[in-house]
Amino acid sequence: MINVAIVEDEQEAVEYLSDCLHRYGEKTGETFSFTHFPEPITFLEKYKPVYDLVFMDIRMPMMDGMQAAKKLREADTSVLLVFVTRMGDYAIQGYDVGATAFIKKPISYFDFEMKMKRIIFAIRQRDSQVITIVSGTAVHRF
């Protein structure tokens, strides 16, 4: 199972991303568990390194996705990060925080599927090189 966090303030985008994940799962046999965070502050306050993949909007109230991504990287360097945004001009900055991909809004399923193939490959590759230790409620990756 692939654990996904969706950090997105637009409910329509959250619903479409979850539909895309379900559709992709039905097509490929992948299973996903996802948690939605409507704003990045709550996501960061509650963050534990249990996610394989984080979808994050860039333009959000109180803290933008780029700032949130920098803080995320302080807590977890191995989680895959995908920006979902209308703001394509942030693509270069995304490399500074190790973004794996950008998905442009409005989201097209074809684009989503193409990027997910690369993302799943990257998750599998990372997992083959990482040891995960679960101790109570803590998860550590080495």
Task: Describe the residue ranges of each PLM region.
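Active-site residues of response regulator receiver
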Residues: 8, 57-58
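Acidic, metal-coordinating helix/loop segments flanking the phosphotransfer/catalytic sites
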Residues: 33-53
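Short amphipathic alpha-helix used as the core "switch/output" element in two-component signaling
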Residues: 66-77
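Conserved binding/recognition cores within well-folded domains
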Residues: 114-142
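A Lys-centered signature of the CheY-like receiver
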Residues: 105
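Acidic catalytic/metal-coordinating carboxylates
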Residues: 39, 64-67
